[in-house]
Amino acid sequence: MKKKIVTILCLSSLLLVACGKTTNATTIQTTNDEVITDNETATTEDSVTDSDDVDLVLDTEDGILQSNETEISAVEVEQVEPLSYQTYLEFMMSQREPNTNAIFSSESLNSAFAIYAELLDTSNKEMFKAYLRNKDYLSYKSIDGLSIINRLWVNELKDFTLTRGPLVDKDIIYMMDMSDSAQATEFKNQFVSESTNGFITETPTVFDKNTFVDAMNIIYFKSKWVGGEKTLCDGLKEFENEDGSTSQVEMFCDFGDYIAKTKTATAYKMDYENGMSFVAILPNEGYTLTDVNIDDFINNNVEYEDADVYAEFPKFEAKSTYMASFDSFNLPLNPPFKEGLTICDTEPPVISQIAKIKFDNEGTEAAAVTEIVKSDSMAMVEPKPHYDFLANRPFIYYIQDYENDDIAFMGVVSNLAD
């Protein structure tokens, strides 16, 4: 029987692209001293009103501007087109250098968006929820092998009052003194390192006296393959890099029963012990990474076919750093805060993410830290068709979080040159 060679692009909660070089990853720094509970909520006569709508108050010593609420109609909210995984994939691809590997976590970014949305006026909060498909990211659960941590870091130099809401109920608020920038930043980095088992040790964000709030999400994943360690292939295998060059690399093999195909790409899935899955999407011959629509596979627009599949995958590592603004995702550049939340709004918030992955025959370890910082400045059985799924050229991948019905990571592998 003639074997079919399938190239795969794969995406997950952590999006990864393999192309060759590895890009540096960006992370967000945070620190925490104490948790503000409902019983410990402070009050400020000058800034807290009697309105039931006032949840947060943030005062600054100088340059105070009271945000004016911008009305967004219910019709406008209903017309919001939710952010798609393809949007995140295209963002990741646009931010990386050509012929480099990359990884990105849409789950982490959306969780940070959900935290920040709790600070916004009602109409903008509802708009953000619509962009996030009205999913309750603040209720996402950690499972064996997947840790999800949310934090809202608040500068202790700013008066802050929180009376109720999910940020209080879930103990997400942490206050810290940011007057000593080096100390505050180091404390934040230590927290990140401890939360990712040392996999990510620092982020690009720096805390200082001008920092108001930092909405942070940390996601850490580590799991072995179902069935144990995969078998290494005999000898080195050739990987065709994105730029047309080739590399001799170590690969491992796998045998599966299902494969999914579209006109432009083919997907193959491998399961982890903790119940999550790694899905690789390989562009078909004649197509490239940019021809792949990841939503076709994630949204189950393509059904998996019962087949006899032989697959090969390279070991790889990737690390990526991203800096962006809200308009990078077609969101309002600087949405106003809720009434009663006094904060300097001259500078729009900045988004940063650092993501990292290690993928081999034993399993996968991956992590991402996202920050949004606001600062001043079957009958008869037919014979199964046979396919070879050889990930020996650039492919996309993602790691699926079934517990929370989301994609934890997505990425690309395009260059395995030393």
What positions do the PLM features span?
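Sec-dependent N-terminal signal peptides of Gram-positive bacterial secreted proteins and lipoproteins
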Residues: K2-T23
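Detector for small/aliphatic-rich hydrophobic stretches
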Residues: C19-M178
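Non-catalytic, conformational "gating/processing" segments within enzyme and secreted inhibitor domains
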Residues: N99-T100, Y137-N284, Y304-V381
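Extracytoplasmic/secreted cell-surface and envelope-processing proteins
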Residues: F113, T122-F128, T288-T290, S320-Y322, ...
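Extended hydrophobic
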Residues: A215, T262, T266-I281, E382-D418
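Composition- and surface-driven signal marking solvent-exposed, interaction-prone regions
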Residues: K230-T231, D291-D296, E371, D405, ...
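Internal alpha/beta scaffold segment
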Residues: P283-E305
